[in-house]
Amino acid sequence: MATSTERAVLAGGCFWGMQDLIRRYPGVISTRVGYSGGDVANATYRNHGTHAEAIEINFDPAVISYRTLLERFFQIHDPTTRNRQGNDVGMSYRSAIYYTSDEQKRVAEDTIADVDASGLWPGKVVTEVAPAGAFWEAEPEHQDYLEKYPNGYTCHFVRPGWKLPVREKAVS
């Protein structure tokens, strides 16, 4: 049992596929899908305003670091398409990192700089980085969706051989 846990909130398109892949990583204790980063209180699937479909992750940082979690996040979705993942188009499907501490913000910005420098994606990263606000849990039918419906829709996948290099830091 973990002695301390951290919380991460990520958005990268339809939350079904994000949850299905992220929950499998060693060190991920729990996940739930919902809505975050927007303007509607008590958001629902039918009424989520400007929120993104997001996943809340509780993880053990002794097993998986926040940096590693973000590297995997960038491996399973395209962070260079604004308001879109696969066939899903709209603000709900934007790429976003909602940080819970100054350290998470620093790691997020550093990881994005590495993704941009790597050339692994065809364009510049458009992932939003913003403080975590309210997280509105999605309806029960959306939780663990692809576990219930293994052949259900997803546009997320692990890209084989994808490894994010760390860029050379400028000497100050």
From Swiss-Prot:
Pfam families tied to this protein: PMSR
Q: Can you state which reaction this protein catalyses? A: L-methionyl-[protein] + [thioredoxin]-disulfide + H2O = L-methionyl-(S)-S-oxide-[protein] + [thioredoxin]-dithiol; [thioredoxin]-disulfide + L-methionine + H2O = L-methionine (S)-S-oxide + [thioredoxin]-dithiol
Q: Which SUPFAM superfamilies match?
A: Peptide methionine sulfoxide reductase
EC identifiers of the protein = 1.8.4.11
Gene Ontology molecular function, alphabetical? L-methionine:thioredoxin-disulfide S-oxidoreductase activity; peptide-methionine (S)-S-oxide reductase activity
Q: Which InterPro entries match?
A: Met_Sox_Rdtase_MsrA_dom, Met_Sox_Rdtase_MsrA_sf
What is the active site of this protein? C14
Q: Which domain of life is it from?
A: Bacteria
Q: Which GO terms describe its biological process?
A: protein modification process
User: What does the similarity note say?
Assistant: Belongs to the MsrA Met sulfoxide reductase family.
Task: Please give the function described in this protein's UniProt entry.
Answer: Has an important function as a repair enzyme for proteins that have been inactivated by oxidation. Catalyzes the reversible oxidation-reduction of methionine sulfoxide in proteins to methionine.
What's the name of the protein?
A: Peptide methionine sulfoxide reductase MsrA 1
Q: Which organism is it from?
A: Mesorhizobium japonicum (strain LMG 29417 / CECT 9101 / MAFF 303099) (Mesorhizobium loti (strain MAFF 303099))
